[in-house]
């Protein structure tokens, strides 16, 4: 490991994660033209952001940096896989890992894994349907489209905010920080689907200002404790396949979980390979009529 990497990792453990993130959040929400234009211009240049797909192509037309970062795309920019039975990638990014959930552990990187129950907020009953199932971890780089969409149609059952640290998420931290995704702050969304239970976890990272969902808006609890909100059949929240479910403001990673025997990977997507929202991530393990809805 280089000296530079060692210094970076030391800073990750010593930095006041939430204080840094709150400060960056204030800057990212600033509507002072000179400040927000300088931030956006520098970001576009540094990360070579492709604005041709954006609904509003002029990066300086956005009122603040966060609006630019969570920009909408043109309606035809991300066509969905034609076969409605196939499971879609929820986001643009890189498949950092995918595979089976074994003995309650999810693979993070060589020599590292993290606990399924810990990832989902420490509730063994919540985790049980996914034991022996499958997971995919998708990392969203700074230049990527940062809205997260539904892999399949689902009815929201529960949303859980899990407080935690805000380590940066990148190959270096994935290979060196134990239990990275089960330590970082995250929002867990559990859906009932034709494939059984599905979880979509939005994992925060250093300088992540916030996470939003389309049903709850900003997820910003004041107490440092796990908070669960359950949704009943009286006013069901149903999100269609490909519909937006949430977005990152300066953030980070989406993890998708399915129960055992529900899906199989589409042509074994390449770990470290790029994927776009709407592309096929997985196929149903059986015909959908043979997979009872929960």
Swiss-Prot record:
It comes from the Bacteria. It is a peripheral membrane protein. Keywords: Cell membrane, Decarboxylase, Lipid biosynthesis, Lipid metabolism, Lyase, Membrane, Phospholipid biosynthesis, Phospholipid metabolism, Pyruvate, Zymogen. Coiled coil: none annotated. Its EC number is 4.1.1.65. The active site is at residues 92, 149, 252. GO terms for biological process: phosphatidylethanolamine biosynthetic process. GO terms for cellular component: plasma membrane. The record marks 251-252 as: Cleavage (non-hydrolytic). Signal peptide: none annotated. Binds 1 pyruvoyl group covalently per subunit. Its main location: membrane. Is synthesized initially as an inactive proenzyme. Formation of the active enzyme involves a self-maturation process in which the active site pyruvoyl group is generated from an internal serine residue via an autocatalytic post-translational modification. Two non-identical subunits are generated from the proenzyme in this reaction, and the pyruvate is formed at the N-terminus of the alpha chain, which is derived from the carboxyl end of the proenzyme. Pathway: Phospholipid metabolism; phosphatidylethanolamine biosynthesis; phosphatidylethanolamine from CDP-diacylglycerol: step 2/2. One of its GO terms (molecular function) is phosphatidylserine decarboxylase activity. Its cofactor is pyruvate. It is found in: Cell membrane. It catalyses: a 1,2-diacyl-sn-glycero-3-phospho-L-serine + H(+) = a 1,2-diacyl-sn-glycero-3-phosphoethanolamine + CO2. Catalyzes the formation of phosphatidylethanolamine (PtdEtn) from phosphatidylserine (PtdSer). Belongs to the phosphatidylserine decarboxylase family. PSD-B subfamily. Prokaryotic type I sub-subfamily. Heterodimer of a large membrane-associated beta subunit and a small pyruvoyl-containing alpha subunit. This is Phosphatidylserine decarboxylase proenzyme. It comes from Bordetella avium (strain 197N).
